[in-house]
Structure formats: C-alpha cells, structure tokens
Amino acid sequence: MTTRIDIRFAELAKQGRSAFVTFLMAGDPDPATSLEIIKALPKSGADVIEIGMPFTDPMADGPSIQAAGLRALKAGMTLKKTLELVRGFRKDDNATPIVLMGYYNPIYIYGVDKFLVDAKSAGVDGLIIVDLPPEEDDELCLPAMKAGLNFIRLATPTTDDKRLPAVLANTSGFVYYVSITGITGAAAADSSAVSEAVARIKRHTKLPVCVGFGIRTPETARAIASHANGAVVGTALVDALKNSLDADGRATAKTVNAVAELTASLAQGVKGAQQAAE
C-alpha cells in the first residue's frame, strides 16, 4: 500500500528537504475554529498534520497539550467529531497527510473495526497510539495496516538496540523519535544527541525518521531538520493558540492567524535546513 504519508516523504526526499510536521488538538478551542486552523496549516508550510484525539487521561502530554484536550472536551469534541473534522479538511485538501495521535481507550470504546473503516473513509492516513506497545500489535496495529493506514511508532532515548527491532517491526509511514525523556513541552531538544539517535535508528530501518518533543523555535526546528527527515512541533503551536483566546478560553479574531503565523515561521526554519546543507 502507498499512503499520502509515503507519497509526501518521497516528494520531499526528491526536493532534498525535511518535513515540517505540526500537531494540534482536535476541537481546540472549539470544533469550527479547529477546522479553520487545520485548513490554514498547509498554506502556512505544514507538510504533515498530526491531530490529537482528546482524552481524559493523557499520560504522555505536558500541561499545554493536556489543557488543549480539556478545552476540546469541554467544547463537546468526541472521536466521531474528530473524524468529521478530518472529513471537513479533506473537502479542500486531498494531498496533505493526516495522522491521528492519542491513546487506545477512545478507539477501543468506539470499536476498532468501525473506527478503522470510518477513519479511512474520512481521509486519515496514519495513527500514533502512544500507549500500545509492539506486544499488543494484534489490538490495533495489524488491523490498521490491513485497513490501509500507516501505524507510526515512537522510539525514545531509552529504546536500546535490543528493543528497537521490535518497535520497528510493524511500523510504517515514518518513525517518530521522541528527543527527550518525559512529557511533551518539557525541555529543548539537543541536536547533537538527536543526530546520533537518528543515525542509530536508520541502521535498523529505511523509513523516514521524524523528531518531536522540545522544538519550539525556527532555530531549533532548523537544527533538528538538518539531522532528521522531519521536525514535529506541537506544544509551541498549542501555546500560540491558547495565548490568542479570550478570558473565557474562547477563540478571538486573532486565533487562526496566531497559529498560522507561527507555523509559517517554523516552516521557514525547517526549509532553512535544506539551504544550510547546500
């Protein structure tokens, strides 16, 4: 199978540049504004879009993304509405890859088979499920692959050479390397450590390696993108969104632009990595 993710990374490889991957929470701060923001991302330079599935117990998320999930849940966001959001995005954009990121519980409650059918028909390309290890591939990973979706796995600084083959075995689309141990948004990524880690992962796989956690500025994005096939930014974009809201946590006239402008700035950083290499 070839997905939009595979096509996008092949296109970028031909251009000799890394992907800029954005993360935002579905339904933050409300479903309508969320769709407007996500539609603005590709125009601002996003190559791949990760969309968080709001969940009440997000153990890997830092305070910013946890708060985004709570705002979305308060606004009535559900997994069904998250798929509707993707469907709405696909009306105008059939090329930009969409990855849903989150936890297994909401999918399990929705029903795995139903979810996979609905996700595929909505226009989802891949899944990142942070609390399903390789030992549980039968639960969702293998059915997702059969349904034509990429299953993207996380590798971390503590994933050693003994563990890495198991992590990579059924991974497709790309590998998501978590550059720091801990929760999202905690610290800055170290580009020299990232360089070594990406090289180590690439000894085990031909898949693109994207790096996330700890990228907040165009400078860091550029440094990371020079070592990896993609740089993922989430917390910084979620913070820009939050800082544009009114005192009651509602969207303002500035909200969409606040996220779009930071996206454009970070995208320039990622694209600068290619120019620096030339």
Curated annotation (Swiss-Prot):
Species assigned in the record: Bradyrhizobium diazoefficiens (strain JCM 10833 / BCRC 13528 / IAM 13628 / NBRC 14792 / USDA 110)
Molecular function per GO: tryptophan synthase activity
Protein name: Tryptophan synthase alpha chain
EC annotation from Swiss-Prot or TrEMBL: 4.2.1.20
Superkingdom field: Bacteria
Sequence similarity: Belongs to the TrpA family.
Pathway terms, separated by semicolons: Amino-acid biosynthesis; L-tryptophan biosynthesis; L-tryptophan from chorismate: step 5/5
Assembly, per entry: Tetramer of two alpha and two beta chains.
Protein keywords: Amino-acid biosynthesis, Aromatic amino acid biosynthesis, Lyase, Tryptophan biosynthesis
Entry-linked Pfam families: Trp_syntA (PF00290)
Active-site residues (renumbered): E50, D61
Record GO biological process: L-tryptophan biosynthetic process
Biological role stated in the UniProt entry: The alpha subunit is responsible for the aldol cleavage of indoleglycerol phosphate to indole and glyceraldehyde 3-phosphate.
Keyword rRNA-binding: no
UniProt key word Amino-acid biosynthesis: yes
InterPro entries, per database record: Aldolase_TIM, RibuloseP-bd_barrel, Trp_synthase_alpha_AS, Trp_synthase_suA
EC class name: lyase
Gene3D superfamilies from the UniProt entry: Aldolase class I
Gene Ontology annotations for the cellular component aspect, listed alphabetically: cytosol
Reactions catalysed, as given in the entry: (1S,2R)-1-C-(indol-3-yl)glycerol 3-phosphate + L-serine = D-glyceraldehyde 3-phosphate + L-tryptophan + H2O
